[in-house]
């Protein structure tokens, strides 16, 4: 998997810090589902400390605050502007850690969560394993193959290099989590279909999310060729793997 330029990723998310919540419908659905999975799989679990990795604007932390109001919370993100928005959402009492999830030394926490973020790491398997071993419970959602395959296919049809991230498979994630010797591991993959008036609208959507990073770099000529090649409606989907991992008995 090619290395991801974290400076570019951080800049993209910083620019999107005010538009993100306006378009992040699926991302918010994933947060709701993740909280529901924690409650359903571990109904007696009451964490004293919660760490949200790749917290973005703080939506997942806000939901967890309602479920576990007495816990101490910490949010991490690579974007300062995203963390500023998150503090506006959840309050100044929540601690924050600015930095790249693959490099930050995170504290041991009862509950570590991450929703739609770890696929932005150059080595998501390493991050998943490391974070899991720092927690009693680790709950996550992550994009897996074949997410956004339709976008890459438009480029392949014109013999152009793929602009998208290389997503790992759900099987790779499953093996990584089992390697941590959990007492409980439950997971599922859900597909979220998306429809846009045109590929150009899809590009706009990704920019508003801050998700417009391309490991291959932005090539305006290639994009113009794709837009000319496929001017009509554009359909794509997110394939999201949800998991709850426990390494303790409750």
UniProtKB/Swiss-Prot annotation:
GO terms for biological process: biotin biosynthetic process; methylation. It catalyses: malonyl-[ACP] + S-adenosyl-L-methionine = malonyl-[ACP] methyl ester + S-adenosyl-L-homocysteine. One of its GO terms (molecular function) is carboxyl-O-methyltransferase activity. Pathway: Cofactor biosynthesis; biotin biosynthesis. Pfam families: Methyltransf_25. InterPro entries: BioC, Methyltransf_25, SAM-dependent_MTases_sf. Its EC number is 2.1.1.197. Keywords: Biotin biosynthesis, Methyltransferase, S-adenosyl-L-methionine, Transferase. Gene3D superfamilies: Vaccinia Virus protein VP39. Converts the free carboxyl group of a malonyl-thioester to its methyl ester by transfer of a methyl group from S-adenosyl-L-methionine (SAM). It allows to synthesize pimeloyl-ACP via the fatty acid synthetic pathway. NCBIfam families: BioC. PANTHER family: TRANS-ACONITATE 2-METHYLTRANSFERASE, TRANS-ACONITATE 2-METHYLTRANSFERASE-RELATED. Belongs to the methyltransferase superfamily. This is Malonyl-[acyl-carrier protein] O-methyltransferase. It comes from Neorickettsia risticii (strain Illinois). The gene is bioC.
């Amino acid at each position: 998997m090619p290395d991801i330029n974290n400076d570019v990723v951080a800049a993209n998310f910083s620019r999107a810090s005010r538009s993100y919540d306006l378009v992040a419908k699926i991302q918010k659905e994933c947060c709701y589902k993740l909280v529901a999975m924690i409650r359903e799989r571990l109904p007696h679990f009451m964490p004293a400390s919660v760490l949200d990795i790749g917290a973005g604007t703080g939506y997942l932390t806000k939901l967890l605050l309602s479920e576990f109001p007495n816990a101490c919370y910490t949010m991490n993100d690579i974007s300062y502007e995203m963390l500023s928005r998150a503090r506006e959402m959840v309050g100044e009492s929540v601690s924050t850690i600015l930095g790249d999830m693959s490099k930050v030394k995170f504290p041991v926490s009862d509950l570590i969560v991450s929703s739609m973020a770890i696929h932005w790491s150059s080595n998501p398997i390493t991050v998943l394993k490391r974070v899991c071993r720092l927690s009693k419970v680790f709950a996550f959602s992550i994009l897996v193959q074949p997410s956004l395959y339709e976008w890459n296919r438009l480029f392949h049809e014109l013999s152009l290099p793929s602009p998208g991230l290389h997503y790992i498979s759900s099987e790779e994630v499953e093996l990584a989590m089992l390697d941590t010797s959990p007492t409980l591991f439950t997971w599922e993959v859900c597909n979220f279909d998306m429809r846009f008036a045109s590929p150009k609208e899809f590009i706009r959507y990704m920019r508003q999310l801050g998700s417009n990073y391309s490991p291959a770099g932005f090539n305006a000529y290639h994009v113009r060729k794709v837009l000319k090649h496929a001017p009509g409606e554009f359909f794509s989907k997110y394939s999201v793997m949800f998991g709850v991992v426990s390494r303790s008995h409750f």
